[in-house]
């Protein structure tokens, strides 16, 4: 049974980060939960943490097990939601199309789902029905993005931050962290009127040479970042660090705008004690986007039929998949019938006319199933179920 435990969307970032799972511990958590409940995938982004499982555990037992396995504080259980079956399937399809993103319609989530799927594959914690569901969700998200053409309206958090930086006419800034979000920021800001863009990374040797060719870009060591704070007007922090990397004692006495795009947060809230610092977190940034939200909502609603089609297809597949054991049993039985007749043919092919022997074997196989069908018809007639039985037998044997 497909089940989902997730964090309620209205939770603020302070609560969300208590449930976040960093990439460094993801594989270990996947394997541990897999041992406890069965097939599992963990989707953990800056805006959501969702645990998808295919398990027969009942709701409370599953929630207790997941909280224990992920070392979550059970006092926070009121902040989670639980859904299963078609509701969990529908939720995932909506997530893949951007319907549940804080920035409505942003397409980063599709890449994040693919990353989560790859991580579960790598950890060998996903198979069967859950694997098929995520394959379907990724296909659904791609189709929705292509047909809806949501890419024509930049809606990712990095694009909104870049737009705000440009609107503020900030010319000197630092990006801390150069993962996917940092690289997107670089993409949006590289062609701006910036004077200097410092990019702080932990390993300078991993920076591709193509990035170093941009004149106004300067890559610096993460450990040296503080020595450059006096030279900039803005910091965008987007690392995957488990602890805070900036506190008020690190900052100079100059006007600074800081965007914290990390979950868990990179910036200690004590920086708000400084009159010269303006801090934006993920929740603040989401509010900035309200102007275009109505336009995207209308456009996305027009193409909702795409995800409805994918939901229907998966539910139909799921129902048919439940027949797999019976189908295999019928096939095995058929193979046994054929094998007996093949053995008979091999034993007699040198002693009898082969044409007559083949005809006899084929007729014998047909009679076997016809006689069995007749027996079932008689049994069901006596049990008062002949009408449905006759309908099925006619559908199988008669054109």
Swiss-Prot record:
Anything else known: During catalysis, the active site Cys acts as a nucleophile attacking the alpha-carbonyl group of tRNA-bound glutamate with the formation of a thioester intermediate between enzyme and glutamate, and the concomitant release of tRNA(Glu). The thioester intermediate is finally reduced by direct hydride transfer from NADPH, to form the product GSA.
Domain remark text: Possesses an unusual extended V-shaped dimeric structure with each monomer consisting of three distinct domains arranged along a curved 'spinal' alpha-helix. The N-terminal catalytic domain specifically recognizes the glutamate moiety of the substrate. The second domain is the NADPH-binding domain, and the third C-terminal domain is responsible for dimerization.
Function field: Catalyzes the NADPH-dependent reduction of glutamyl-tRNA(Glu) to glutamate 1-semialdehyde (GSA).
Site annotation Important for activity: residues: 91
GO BP terms: protoporphyrinogen IX biosynthetic process from glutamate
GO MF term (any one): NADP binding
Family of the protein in this entry: Belongs to the glutamyl-tRNA reductase family.
Residues where NADP(+) binds: 177-182
Keyword Amino-acid biosynthesis: no
Official protein name in the record: Glutamyl-tRNA reductase
Pathways per UniProt: Porphyrin-containing compound metabolism; protoporphyrin-IX biosynthesis; 5-aminolevulinate from L-glutamyl-tRNA(Glu): step 1/2
Catalyzed reactions: (S)-4-amino-5-oxopentanoate + tRNA(Glu) + NADP(+) = L-glutamyl-tRNA(Glu) + NADPH + H(+)
Pfam families membership: GlutR_dimer, GlutR_N, Shikimate_DH
Keywords attached to this entry: NADP, Oxidoreductase, Porphyrin biosynthesis
Organism: Clostridium kluyveri (strain ATCC 8527 / DSM 555 / NBRC 12016 / NCIMB 10680 / K1)
Active site residues per record: 46
Subunit and partners: Homodimer.
UniProt-annotated binding residues for substrate: 45-48, 101, 106-108, 112
The gene coding this protein: hemA
Assigned EC number: 1.2.1.70
Organism superkingdom: Bacteria
Top-level class of the enzyme under EC nomenclature: oxidoreductase
């Amino acid at each position: 049974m497909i089940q989902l435990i997730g964090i309620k969307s209205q939770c603020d970032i302070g609560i969300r980060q208590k449930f976040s799972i960093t990439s460094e511990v993801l594989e270990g958590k996947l394997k541990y939960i897999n041992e406890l409940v069965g097939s599992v995938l963990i989707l953990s982004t800056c805006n959501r943490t969702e645990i998808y499982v295919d398990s027969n555990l009942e709701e409370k037992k599953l929630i207790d097990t997941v909280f224990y396995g992920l070392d979550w504080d059970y006092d926070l259980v009121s902040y989670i939601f639980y859904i299963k079956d078609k509701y969990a399937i529908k939720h995932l399809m909506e997530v893949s199309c951007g319907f549940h993103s804080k920035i409505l319609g942003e397409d980063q989530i599709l890449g994040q789902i693919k990353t989560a799927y790859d991580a579960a594959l790598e950890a060998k914690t996903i198979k069967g029905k859950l694997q098929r569901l995520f394959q379907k969700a990724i296909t659904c998200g791609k189709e929705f993005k292509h047909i809806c053409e949501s890419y024509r309206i930049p809606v990712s958090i990095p694009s909104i931050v870049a737009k705000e930086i440009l609107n503020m006419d900030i010319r000197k800034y630092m990006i801390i962290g150069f993962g996917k979000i940092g690289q997107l920021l670089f993409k949006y800001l590289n062609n701006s009127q910036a004077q200097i863009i410092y990019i702080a990374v932990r390993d300078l040797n991993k920076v591709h040479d193509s990035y170093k060719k941009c004149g106004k870009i300067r890559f610096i060591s993460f450990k040296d970042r503080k020595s450059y704070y006096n030279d900039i007007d803005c910091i965008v922090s987007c690392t995957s660090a488990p602890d805070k990397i900036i506190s008020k004692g690190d900052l100079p006495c100059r006007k600074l705008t800081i965007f914290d795009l990390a979950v868990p947060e990179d910036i200690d809230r004590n920086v708000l004690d400084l009159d010269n610092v303006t801090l934006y977190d993920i929740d603040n940034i989401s509010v900035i986007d309200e102007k275009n939200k109505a336009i995207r909502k209308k456009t996305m609603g027009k193409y909702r039929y795409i995800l409805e089609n994918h939901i229907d297809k998966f539910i139909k597949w799921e129902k048919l998949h439940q027949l797999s054991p019976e189908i295999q049993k019928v096939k095995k039985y058929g193979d046994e019938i054929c094998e007996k007749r093949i053995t008979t043919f091999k034993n007699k092919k040198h002693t009898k006319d082969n044409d007559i022997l083949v005809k006899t074997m084929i007729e014998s196989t047909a009679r076997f199933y016809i006689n069995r069908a007749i027996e079932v018809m008689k049994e069901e007639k006596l049990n008062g179920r002949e009408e449905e039985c006759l309908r099925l037998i006619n559908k199988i044997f008669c054109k």
